[in-house]
Amino acid sequence: MNNVLKNAGLFLRLFWLRFQQNKLSQAAGYLTYSTMLALVPLVMVVFSVFSAFPVFNEVTDELKGFIFNNFAPQASDMVGQYIDEFVSNSKQMSAVGVISLVVVALMLINSIDRTLNSIWHDTTIRPLVFSFAIYWLILTLGPLLIGASIGVSSYIAAMLNENISLPFGLKILSFVPFFLTWLIFTLIYTVVPNKKVKIMHSAIGALVAAVFFTLGKQAFLWYVTTFPSYQLIYGAMATLPIMLLWIQLSWVVILIGAQLASVLADYTLCTQGKIRVEELVAADTHEPALQQKMEKTEQTLKTEITQQKQRLEKQG
């Protein structure tokens, strides 16, 4: 029992130190600002990609519903009108205008990339061509994956609504949207950081983020429907603070999930006695000696694990 409490205290201490170091609330604010600037370009790019694939024509309305439910509670009519105007105006833009919007969208992806890598305290810089290729794949393949997931979720929801007497095994399918959110967060925490992240750590951080994201969405929707005082204060401009607040909360949840995945790796080193919390935190000042010690510690752990596996195989 004492060991459990001691380990829990160590983990919470390390998490709190990381939270203060990473300044997650400020990082979330920065990403919120970047998201608002890149929102129109992203919407334009996403729907342009969908228009190039007729199979996703029926998914367009579902995607709008997804945006309303996740990023614009109680503002669906106004946001829907804006989206239609954005898509209509994008068809009349020149090549230079389209390129500039794509660049802004890529800048948002770059901001997310740098913010997540800062949580893992990785200063490695990818080659420019490699980074551009990754960002472009995210920008083009991302909408297709989102469209596919929304299509599957909509199909399952329709099936469940039509037949309420489905067996329990099939009713579990109603959790597919949650599992898709969990999968997306896991992929983000695994692929985006330059450091190698264990899939178990990514999955745990993503699970916590997905749970808080889902609960937060329901709580936020309940708040804006139960206490509509913001409409009296802001009037026709009420959509803007609603979206700003929800995007801010969403980024806080996503970054906390990323930090949890990062802290799990640090926590493992500390519990094995390979490095102290003070040394681990001090290493993030990028002092070469401490950085080298951390790298050496990780390498030593890998060697010990390999040797232990070899001994077990011989004994077997």
UniProtKB/Swiss-Prot annotation:
It holds the Pfam family Virul_fac_BrkB. It is found in: Cell inner membrane. InterPro entries: UPF0761_bac (IPR023679), Virul_fac_BrkB (IPR017039). It is a multi-pass membrane protein. One of its GO terms (cellular component) is plasma membrane. The chain crosses the membrane at residues 36-56, 92-112, 128-148, 172-192, 204-224, 236-256. HAMAP family: UPF0761. Belongs to the UPF0761 family. This is UPF0761 membrane protein PM1616.
